[in-house]
């Protein structure tokens, strides 16, 4: 056990130690797990039981995992995991390590299983455009606190990072957008068609650029001049037979961590001075998992009248399900009493002109050579599922969430395609297509549905009637119009692209046609990845 872990455990209060012993992370028996990563037995433990636990005191720069992975700098973080720039001591390589939060240990096991399958396919198909798993293991702090660690190539950063600031804040050049989208669709074509995997979290944060940005080069430069390699070689010569004696090996590891901590001192100073280049990746908090039965895996026919829910029927189970999903002010009684909002006057899609030319921010956040000739990889399979094991819970980031998911209808692979279209629009304009924020105290789902119907078109009546959430989302007395929203005029993507983002008519027409193929509200008529790859808008991409 390393010095930092021993120190931390020695400083823990007795009550905290007892809490550690009690803590256990639940698993779902329907999940498929990698046999090499053990999972915990299920047991409910409240958040208060681990409130004294501080992960940063254990997982920190200079920490050595598996005897060979030296953590240099945290380069990404979300609700459920962190990503570290890592030095592989044995192979003398700089890599990326994803460390799953111990509370989501079994989600990490599921992700490893999925990425293992992806990586097996990728060995013989180099143009797959998905991250490849190089190694995985688990780190055990105590019997009940375990981390799943997975190793990947080091990338330059995500597209989200590129769009936040700098010269591409208001969108990327269209040839680059087309290249990225073609690579993304190529990866999804394989995931859906050959590997039976739904990603369910396609967004700019999860699309990585290949390359080595300046801040990573600076970290490597500082590490190289620290003399770690020479000190490590000297340490190994002092302990030639360390693997034959556990006590000697522990002593070796303690000394290794001393020289590792010394090696990253300048990197920590650089990090404190700059305090940049760590991406904060938002995650959706829903973690309760129920799974579709295999009988649900067919494409759903929303026009089948026999399965409509009657608004006058007893819907006890549905009400219970929706009470769990709604916010505190969104019980049906309160929604029915809210005033109808006129959202149309809040949105003038013709007045916000593109700011690309007038922007004074011309910085290259990532070297242009990695952008113009981009090679990308789809990442973060922590929310992914094999198709026949997909969750019943709400999936996808809010901004890229498909209408069938909002309506709580059966979803298929094409929910990922909806997300692709949203991402394509954002890459080309710098703006999120659907970004509901609960206008006029509306539920965000109602605001989201308004934006979808305003821009894309009306949701088919059959889908509205089929929705388990129809009482919360639609007003039957107004012909299943969106609840609490006044009548509004629709617009269209072609008009928005020309008037707001100054696309030429030809560019807008072609791009809007491509987007609408992926934004078909009825998933049965939405294009799949293979069909979109054949769309004329992508014809000029190599």
From Swiss-Prot:
The entry's keywords: ATP-binding, Kinase, Nucleotide-binding, Serine/threonine-protein kinase, Transferase
UniProt biased composition (Basic and acidic residues): 20-30
EC category name: transferase
Record protein name field: Putative serine/threonine-protein kinase L205
UniProt-listed Enzyme Commission number(s): 2.7.11.1
Record's catalysed reaction(s): L-seryl-[protein] + ATP = O-phospho-L-seryl-[protein] + ADP + H(+); L-threonyl-[protein] + ATP = O-phospho-L-threonyl-[protein] + ADP + H(+)
Segments of skewed composition (Acidic residues): 31-49, 295-314
């Amino acid at each position: 056990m390393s010095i930092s872990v021993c120190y931390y455990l020695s400083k823990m209060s007795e009550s905290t130690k007892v809490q550690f012993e009690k803590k256990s992370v639940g698993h779902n028996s329907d999940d498929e797990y990698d046999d090499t990563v053990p999972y915990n037995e299920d047991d409910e433990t409240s958040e208060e039981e681990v409130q004294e636990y501080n992960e940063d005191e254990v997982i920190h720069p200079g920490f050595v995992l598996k005897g060979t992975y030296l953590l240099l700098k945290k380069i990404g973080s979300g609700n459920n995991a962190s990503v570290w720039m890592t030095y592989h001591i044995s192979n003398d390589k700089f890599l990326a390590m994803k460390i799953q939060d111990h509370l989501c240990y079994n989600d990490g096991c599921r992700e490893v299983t999925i990425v293992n399958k992806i990586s097996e396919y990728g060995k013989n198909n180099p143009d797959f455009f998905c991250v490849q798993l190089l190694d995985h293991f688990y780190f055990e702090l105590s019997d009940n606190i375990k981390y799943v660690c997975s190793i990947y190539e080091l990338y330059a950063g995500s597209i989200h990072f590129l769009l936040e600031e700098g010269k591409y804040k208001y969108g990327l050049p269209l040839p680059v957008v087309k290249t990225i989208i073609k690579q993304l669709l190529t990866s999804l074509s394989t995931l859906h068609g050959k590997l039976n995997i739904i990603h369910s979290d396609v967004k700019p944060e999860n699309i990585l650029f290949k390359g080595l940005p300046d801040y990573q080069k600076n970290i490597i430069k500082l590490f190289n001049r620290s003399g770690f390699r020479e000190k490590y070689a000297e340490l190994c010569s002092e302990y030639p037979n360390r693997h034959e004696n556990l006590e000697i090996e522990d002593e070796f590891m303690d000394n290794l961590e001393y020289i590792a901590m010394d090696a990253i001192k300048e990197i920590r100073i650089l990090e404190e001075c700059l305090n940049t280049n760590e991406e904060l990746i938002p995650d959706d908090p829903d973690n309760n998992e129920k799974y579709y039965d295999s009988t649900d895996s067919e494409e759903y026919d929303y026009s089948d009248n026999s399965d409509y829910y009657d608004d006058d029927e007893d819907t006890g189970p549905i009400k219970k399900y929706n009470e769990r999903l709604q916010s505190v002010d969104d019980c049906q009684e309160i929604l029915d009493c809210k005033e109808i909002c006129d959202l149309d006057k809040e949105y003038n899609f013709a007045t916000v002109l593109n700011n690309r030319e007038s922007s004074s921010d011309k910085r290259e956040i990532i070297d242009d050579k990695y952008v113009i000739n981009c090679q990308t990889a789809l990442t973060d399979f922590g929310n992914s599922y094999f198709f026949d094991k997909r969750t019943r819970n709400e999936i996808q980031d809010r901004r890229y969430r498909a209408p069938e998911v909002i309506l709580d209808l059966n979803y298929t692979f094409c929910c990922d395609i909806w997300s692709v279209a949203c991402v394509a629009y954002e890459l080309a304009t710098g703006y999120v297509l659907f970004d509901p924020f609960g206008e006029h105290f509306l539920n965000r789902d109602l605001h989201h549905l308004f934006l979808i119907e305003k821009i894309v078109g009306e949701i088919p009546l059959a889908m509205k009637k089929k929705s388990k959430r129809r009482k919360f989302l639609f007003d039957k007395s107004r012909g299943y119009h969106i609840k609490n929203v006044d009548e509004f005029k629709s617009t269209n993507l072609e008009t928005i692209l020309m008037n707001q983002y100054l696309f030429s008519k030809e560019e807008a027409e072609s791009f809007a046609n491509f987007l609408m193929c992926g934004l078909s509200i009825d998933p049965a008529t939405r294009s799949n990845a293979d069909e979109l790859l054949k769309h004329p808008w992508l014809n000029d991409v190599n």
